[in-house]
């Protein structure tokens, strides 16, 4: 007699095999049973004859037949179930493994003894398998077969009734087979909560078909057909009608709206709007430019844009030219973008102004769309013959290509035609109820085809495409959706989970796709808006199955109503249809099926197949069918349930990933790897989000374990210890992967293996790897991270608040999160970062997703995050920051400004920065004056714009400030009650420059040759941090928002209370003897930075993450300069933001807070990088209270301090948030203006570190530094940055040696 332990041992390699429920169990009867009966077609004699000829018992034939049925309905190749013994009515387990290399006769032979051992060894009385018996059979399976019952073995009616009762108490489905000369039948008894009667009848008939196929002598399982004639007839009725091909053109349909509603808004973007008239004219301009460059049918044109209204213009322009477009995401690695452009032999790239440099590296020619120059060029075509309706591209021509993850290691391009897109259009428009009142929010990345549907379908319907900025899309999604008055939103269920339907009163329809959605996640939506769930693939023009989710009771149902046809076939043989309810591969037929894969005939022929024979019998004519690779089941009510992927392709947060491609790049990144597996790991209890993990067996870790050991592996035997050597390599490996793959395809964890586990058939046991990895705790996984930290509890209220935020969004307990823990190491990702930012904002913290990426450690994030300031805070009262008589101060200010006393609003001292800048202006009237052209949208309201500028000036006194000199108080700022001077003149250059005592800000409107607005502004009233804020406020004021009052007086009050800086600067400069770099021709030479060089290098995520990017760059330049000078004690100038000052609301004040200070770094060749980083950051942090003193004051603190201020290299780290905070409407590129205004030294370095890219712009004096020298310096800076990021334990001397070896 067997024991429960013996059963567990016998079935340990098998996952539970449960017959699936076909019903939504809510309200279903799960206790009562029903039965159906099917008579066998083959008489008793044929079954017995087959049994005798093959030397197997009839029971074995029936067991294998039931195993085949289970395989079909569960999708599992390893099946197990219970068998009621004929002799003693005990229950024994039966296990059968079906593999493609096994024939039926082999399987029958292996099952001749049901357990492969002595009969009865695994028998257990039914009473022992109940809850009372302490052992549940449902632990392994939920079905049982009882038979054959023949001759004297037939039980009495009483015995049969008792056995049936016992079996039904244990199992959900019992198949009883009675075989005799007089009666041969199958009785299938099932729980009513499992299936309906017609479904049970289909299962019983599938059992009958399986028996029939076995005794007919078929050997290959992929030749077995379990389909009944009833199922075939039903499927044929469902799929009788195919959608027709359309000869219409998308551009024509959109053009109709351009004629009917020219003034209606077609695109509403964060960067401005386009009417349908503008959409037509501008896209036609793009068309003409592209035609002249040879673009036409079957020519693929990459489009590279950040989120922008101009991307829609580019798409439509390519379509009008007859070409096919490919949307690229600039956030993807340049190497991946280049491989896509090479794949399509791109002649040119259509790009935004911001992405032009990146685009230049992808193709030989770049066409700029957007920006003043490009817009003016397109405007030249307005009024020309609009031949956009000329028939250029035929319906079969390519409309677009989408590149998805490919198993060969390179992206594969899916090509869709005009006709396939148009075939999906009618049903899509109807399902989403899109019309000319729809406002569709374009959330998806440009790398995914959903964004194409969001744009083109909306325009075909006459609606408005709403385009958020990248920053709002990630950091403030709720506000962005509200801002646009969104009616339709397409997101993944993961994103929908972080949104609240109550926040969107205008929303009518939400579309969920890209991944499975759980019913409980949809409940909050179905009672507020229409919920559409999309199932589809890029190969089928986005959508092949769609459903409308109605009441909560029906949200599990998915109906395909797209005009195409769906079939379910044997995954190993598409010539065999599956029964209704059985698991099989989904085939899609119809006009929505795409053309195939670009330049990949082999992959295309495997996936886009000719119609199978059974389909050709149904309808005449050939058609292409798409093999989806998805395993699904279709029930008798036409509902579809996704089961899993057939291949190694997975979806993570809605993004399709081919595991083979990731494995390919992991092998390239780890040359020592002998075997590599990448899996999507899902925790059983959902305590952490799904993540990609890479399992690597390398020469260094591999053991000499036997095959037997690899088949019986445990977690202790499989996973290697995370050595220090391994952790030191993780950063480099991850950096290589990020260079080659989008971030969502980079594994979160890389696990080294001792052995690669095998299945019993000696294949890699992916399932076991997944199970073992899922069982690892967060603490276990952290051991495999590159950086190890010890637990430190939060030390202040802000850290405690962020500990709670981390815990809520990551699903962790508080005691699992320390102050030094890394958000992404704990399991965070871009989507949970969005949730974190939203949660923090609700708690009145000023946090963005970019902040989370910049400072992922909890303590760092808390330190860099401020509470939103209280709007009721009092600022210093007017005239209180200058001692003396108010009347006298006002009278002197009015006299010098030549204004009446009544308009003087306040007077306070200048900052040291302002004093220095004004001193330079007195010598050179043009010094530190920026001239910025503000591009004006075509439909700008100039009166409204002028009032918007006035509102910005009223809210920010710094823009109404003049500078005067007082003999008693020195340089003073005078705030006056006036608007910014608005001058209308066609001669911009001849306008009087700003001067002392005069306004420091001017606006000049030019009417000819074209309308343009110019901003002249002195650096004394702005800096690189405040200028984007100013344009953002201008946009808000133009759109009617009220601006908060932000005087500079609070910052001036802080400066007046600064501690004495003498000790700090004297200590920092003491003993400095190194010469400045570069050397000037003579001491009185004034550098003139007339040359420019740029350099960009990809750097890995820093391993010493406790140090800021600014600290890393300072050290990188110090090493570069030390190498060039041959010295270890170097100094240069650096610009600090000044925004670390403890002043409320300083982050939103339009005041120049930057300060220039000397930076001295002494290197030690025997010290590791981390030690020097710590020293640099410590010195900088201690210097925050003293950074506003000014260079003039520092130089008066002694000879050494004066020498430190004689630097000739200035390093400025640009804030990564500047670009993201650019305004929505008046978008202007101010970077060059900023560079020129700051560039007064021999070398001026402007650095930006973002998304692992270090970008450096150098303005330098070409008479002092040669072009070759400057290029070498920039390359060495990039190399040093890479070394510092990748290996903080590396010695400084080793980096200097590596630079020397490059010479």
UniProtKB/Swiss-Prot annotation:
Alphabetical list of PROSITE patterns matching this protein: CARRIER, PHOSPHOPANTETHEINE
Gene3D superfamilies linked: 3.30.300.30, 3.40.50.980, ACP-like (1.10.1200.10), Chloramphenicol acetyltransferase-like domain (3.30.559.10), Luciferase, Domain 3 (2.30.38.10), Nonribosomal peptide synthetase, condensation domain (3.30.559.30)
Pfam families, alphabetized: AMP-binding, Condensation, PP-binding
InterPro entries per the UniProt record, alphabetical: AA_adenyl_dom (IPR010071), ACP-like_sf (IPR036736), AMP-bd_C_sf (IPR045851), AMP-dep_synth/lig_dom (IPR000873), CAT-like_dom_sf (IPR023213), Condensatn (IPR001242), PKS_PP-bd (IPR020806), PP-bd_ACP (IPR009081)
Cited function: D-lysergyl-peptide-synthetase subunit 2; part of the gene cluster that mediates the biosynthesis of fungal ergot alkaloid. DmaW catalyzes the first step of ergot alkaloid biosynthesis by condensing dimethylallyl diphosphate (DMAP) and tryptophan to form 4-dimethylallyl-L-tryptophan. The second step is catalyzed by the methyltransferase easF that methylates 4-dimethylallyl-L-tryptophan in the presence of S-adenosyl-L-methionine, resulting in the formation of 4-dimethylallyl-L-abrine.
Free-text note on domains in this protein's UniProt record: NRP synthetases are composed of discrete domains (adenylation (A), thiolation (T) or peptidyl carrier protein (PCP) and condensation (C) domains) which when grouped together are referred to as a single module. Each module is responsible for the recognition (via the A domain) and incorporation of a single amino acid into the growing peptide product. Thus, an NRP synthetase is generally composed of one or more modules and can terminate in a thioesterase domain (TE) or reductase domain (R) that releases the newly synthesized peptide from the enzyme.
Family: Belongs to the NRP synthetase family.
Name used for this protein in its record: D-lysergyl-peptide-synthetase subunit 2
Species this chain originates from: Claviceps purpurea (strain 20.1) (Ergot fungus)
Gene field: lpsB
